[in-house]
């Protein structure tokens, strides 16, 4: 039997995942962070990106979060996400369209463009596309 910890992934709408895991990997403000059982207590901001979890037994699942907070306690990890969903439920066509729209907004020379908003939209779209691609690789 492997060493595990409890994980909850919760969005504003509902609980996405609750269960026992061996590993959690998420995109924090300073880069990727891996949480294993017994990790030191931690509170960090999450950036838009994937959350990879390794379930008891070695199966991996991939989720997409659009930012939020990650809290680590001695026997529990909690992700409070602004938006969260399973990566396989993401709409690839919509993510590609959002990426193209954000890139066009950044490339335009118009004065009415809010570049920080366009950059945030681009980051979200790219994160969704990466999560979709990793899910596709996992299924092969």
Swiss-Prot record:
GO terms for cellular component: plasma membrane; proton-transporting ATP synthase complex. It comes from Legionella pneumophila (strain Lens). One of its GO terms (molecular function) is ATP binding. It is found in: Cell inner membrane. The lineage of its organism: Bacteria, Pseudomonadati, Pseudomonadota, Gammaproteobacteria, Legionellales. It is a peripheral membrane protein. The keyword Protein biosynthesis does not apply. HAMAP family: ATP_synth_epsil_bac (MF_00530). It comes from the Bacteria. The gene is atpC. NCBIfam families: ATP_synt_epsi, PRK00571.1-4. Keywords: ATP synthesis, Cell inner membrane, Cell membrane, CF(1), Hydrogen ion transport, Ion transport, Membrane, Transport. Belongs to the ATPase epsilon chain family. InterPro entries: ATP_F1_dsu/esu_C_sf, ATP_synth_F1_dsu/esu, ATP_synth_F1_dsu/esu_N, ATP_synth_F1_esu_C, ATPsynth_dsu/esu_N. Pfam families: ATP-synt_DE, ATP-synt_DE_N. This is ATP synthase epsilon chain.
């Amino acid at each position: 039997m492997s060493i595990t910890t409890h994980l909850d992934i919760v969005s504003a709408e509902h609980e996405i995942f609750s269960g026992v895991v061996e590993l959690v990997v998420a995109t924090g403000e300073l880069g990727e962070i891996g949480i294993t059982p017994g990790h030191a207590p931690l509170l960090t901001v999450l950036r838009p990106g994937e959350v990879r979890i390794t379930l008891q037994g070695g199966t991996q699942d991939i989720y997409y979060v659009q930012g939020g907070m990650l809290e680590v306690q001695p026997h529990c990890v909690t992700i409070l996400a602004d938006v969260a969903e399973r990566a396989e439920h993401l709409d690839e066509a919509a993510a590609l369209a959002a990426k193209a729209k954000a890139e066009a907004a950044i490339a335009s020379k118009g004065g009415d463009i809010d570049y920080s908003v366009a950059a945030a939209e681009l980051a979200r779209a790219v994160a969704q596309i990466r999560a979709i691609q990793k899910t596709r690789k996992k299924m092969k």
